[in-house]
Amino acid sequence: MNTPSARIAVVIPCFRVREQVLDVIAAIGPEVGWIFAVDDACPEHSGRWIEEHCRDPRVKVLRHEVNQGVGGAVMTGYRAALETASEVIVKIEGDGQMDPAL
């Protein structure tokens, strides 16, 4: 986590992904140093769910007060990732449709 070799950040837009997002996060390997989960005003409160049930110290939840769509959520995550020492930023869907193993 956040080691010199872990220079990859992952952005996960979160909207109605509460049932799958913890499994997605758990499948992200140690080569990733930062995980930004963006709760896009999710009616299921995905961000709060992640904070309450995920113990991965790499995870930071970001929140939108108003839904901005997947593009807005991705941009919020990208901006946060750019503030880290990451060299690569990867967007992964929170519903499990993409293999999070890098």
Stretches with model-predicted labels:
Residues 1-102:
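Structured catalytic core of nucleotide-sugar glycosyltransferases
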